[in-house]
């Protein structure tokens, strides 16, 4: 019986995951909460419609093409104005 008790004692000494402190519990449950938050965000991005009215917001930062003015020229003008504002 003493050989069995010694082997159980040695196995208990090698088990480093048996005792969990507050920090490891906090990390484990924090990772679960983070994974749940990521799942909710990704599912919301996939399932939600983009502008249900079909109208685009002109102040959203998107660059659209005007009549006769290509998008590239507008981007250049926007960058030039932003650079000028920084001076």
Swiss-Prot record:
List UniProt keywords, sorted A-Z: Membrane, Transmembrane, Transmembrane helix
Q: Does the keyword Transmembrane helix apply?
A: yes
> Superkingdom of this entry's organism?
Eukaryota
Which residue spans traverse the membrane? 25-47
Location comes to: Membrane
- Per the record, what is one GO cellular component? membrane
Q: Where is this region: Disordered?
A: 51-87
Principal localization reads membrane
Name assigned to this protein: Protein anon-73B1
């Amino acid at each position: 019986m003493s050989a069995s008790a010694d082997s159980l004692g040695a196995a208990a000494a090698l088990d480093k995951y048996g005792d969990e402190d507050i920090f490891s519990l906090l990390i484990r449950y924090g990772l679960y909460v983070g994974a749940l938050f990521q799942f909710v965000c990704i599912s919301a991005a996939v399932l939600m419609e983009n502008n249900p009215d079909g109208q685009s917001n002109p102040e959203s930062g998107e660059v659209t093409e005007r009549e006769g003015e290509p998008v590239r020229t507008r981007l250049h003008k926007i960058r030039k104005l932003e650079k000028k504002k920084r001076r």
